[in-house]
């Protein structure tokens, strides 16, 4: 079985046209990280430039500035890197061209495999790979397994840093390099999941420990919906419980989550 992890960095913004408002991502760096069980991983790294027309830039100027400073450190006007792929000057056409190139590379990587698992961690990558309809492929979001953020993983597991690499494009110490992120997530996948019927599965926290965790959070957190004893708060309480597990990277399956809701009479 071939496992493929995809991460895309670029400039995300609002595009306004005759079809209404559309959120699009113009790629600057794409990493396709793939491996099979008991084999070494391989990496395809693509860089792009161009594709942001003046109108798209003006509308999203503040958002682009934040993304450049605090996320990926690419700039709109930087010189193209060696082997960087030029995107069309029209933003919508650039968006379509970027997606098409990623699709073509995925087809090339997966064409000789009859069982494929395409992995992503949130972001637009999930929508992209689902729309590609790669033959024999299943798409899975690591967030559905409560996979912690890369920032939390490297804080909690120091060995993830020493055993992971990045690329020289990003400032030293940045956790937002797609190469670095894919190495860290690959390490987490190996240590925390197994393949069952073509998808990744993660052992659920047992019911008793899950209840103890929620009781602890209720006692520790000042502002939570359990302070109000009202049936109108039930949905908020359910959302709060689920969020606590996700924020702390704890996976609880739906059966156990349902039992916890029943314990607190959240029908």
UniProtKB/Swiss-Prot annotation:
UniProt keyword list: Early protein, Host-virus interaction, Inhibition of host innate immune response by virus, Inhibition of host RIG-I by virus, Inhibition of host RLR pathway by virus, Viral immunoevasion
Superkingdom classification of source: Viruses
Induction annotation: Expressed in the early phase of the viral replicative cycle.
GO biological process: symbiont-mediated suppression of host cytoplasmic pattern recognition receptor signaling pathway via inhibition of RIG-I activity
Recorded family membership: Belongs to the asfivirus I267L family.
Protein name: Protein I267L
């Amino acid at each position: 079985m071939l496992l493929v992890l995809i991460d895309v960095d670029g400039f995300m913004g609002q595009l306004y046209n005759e079809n209404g408002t559309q959120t699009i991502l113009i790629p600057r760096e794409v990493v396709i990280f793939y491996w099979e069980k008991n084999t070494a991983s391989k990496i395809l790294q693509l860089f792009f430039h161009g594709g942001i027309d003046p109108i798209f830039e003006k509308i999203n100027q503040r958002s682009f500035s934040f993304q450049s400073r605090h996320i990926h450190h690419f700039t709109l006007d930087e010189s193209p890197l060696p082997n960087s792929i030029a995107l069309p000057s029209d933003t919508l056409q650039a968006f379509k061209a970027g997606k098409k190139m990623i699709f073509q590379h995925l087809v090339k990587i997966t064409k000789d495999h009859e069982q494929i698992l395409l992995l992503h961690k949130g972001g637009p990558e999930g929508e992209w790979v689902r729309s590609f309809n790669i033959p024999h492929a299943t798409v899975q979001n690591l967030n559905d397994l409560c996979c912690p953020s890369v920032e939390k993983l490297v804080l909690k597991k120091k060995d993830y840093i020493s055993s992971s690499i990045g690329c020289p494009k990003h400032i030293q110490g940045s956790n937002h390099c797609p190469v670095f992120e894919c190495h860290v997530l690959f390490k987490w996948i190996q240590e925390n999941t197994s393949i069952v019927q073509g998808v990744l599965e993660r052992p659920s926290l047992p019911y008793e420990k899950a209840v103890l965790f929620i009781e602890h959070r209720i006692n520790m957190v000042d502002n939570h919906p359990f302070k109000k004893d009202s049936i109108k708060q039930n949905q908020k309480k359910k959302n709060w419980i689920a969020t606590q597990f996700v924020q702390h990277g704890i996976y609880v399956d739906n059966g156990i989550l349902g039992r916890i809701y029943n314990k607190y009479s959240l029908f």
